Amino acid sequence: MRTLWIVAVCLIGVEGSLLEFGMMILGETGKNPLTSYSFYGCYCGVGGKGTPKDATDRCCFVHDCCYGNLPDCSPKTDRYKYHRENGAIVCGKGTSCENRICECDRAAAICFRKNLKTYNHIYMYYPDFLCKKESEKC
């Protein structure tokens, strides 16, 4: 419960689906989304370039691609609803954009959980200048 409170406090001021996405990540991984994923590797967080450093960073690359496939939506600001059924994330009823954004976030949160065993603390707060190569295509 304390972790949930810390995440809620850290996310005050964060708008739109970033709040829901953070709560999904916490629920799937048990990790604080801000400290564990906001600056991880070359793709987690704002922007991204180069080659993903590992499977977790690849989750972020795929998530960026998913958002990129939503040109008529605003993935970082459009809010959506979701709930859990038997532990699984279920996107709620909403607009087409809300549902597609939710599905992008859901897939990334599940990807993070599936790759917890290979999460590498070396890539937390990874410096951008080490992500030199041109980005892969989605």
UniProtKB/Swiss-Prot annotation:
Major localisation: secreted
Pfam families from the UniProt entry: Phospholip_A2_1
Cofactor binding comment, as recorded: Binds 1 Ca(2+) ion.
Signal peptide: 1-16
Site (Putative membrane binding site) location in chain: L18, L19, L34, T35, F39, V46, K76, T77, R79, Y82, M124, Y125, F129
Cofactor(s) listed in the protein's UniProt record: Ca(2+)
Protein purpose: Snake venom phospholipase A2 (PLA2) that acts as a presynaptic neurotoxin, an inhibitor of blood coagulation, and has been found to bind with high affinity to intracellular proteins. The response of indirectly stimulated neuromuscular preparations to ammodytoxin (Atx) is triphasic. The first phase, the transient inhibition of the acetylcholine (ACh) release, starts soon after the addition of Atx and lasts for several minutes. This phase is probably independent of Atx enzymatic activity. The effect may be due to the specific binding of the toxin to presynaptic receptors.
Assembly mode: Monomer.
Protein's UniProt name: Basic phospholipase A2 ammodytoxin B
Native source species: Vipera ammodytes ammodytes (Western sand viper)
Species lineage: Eukaryota, Metazoa, Chordata, Craniata, Vertebrata
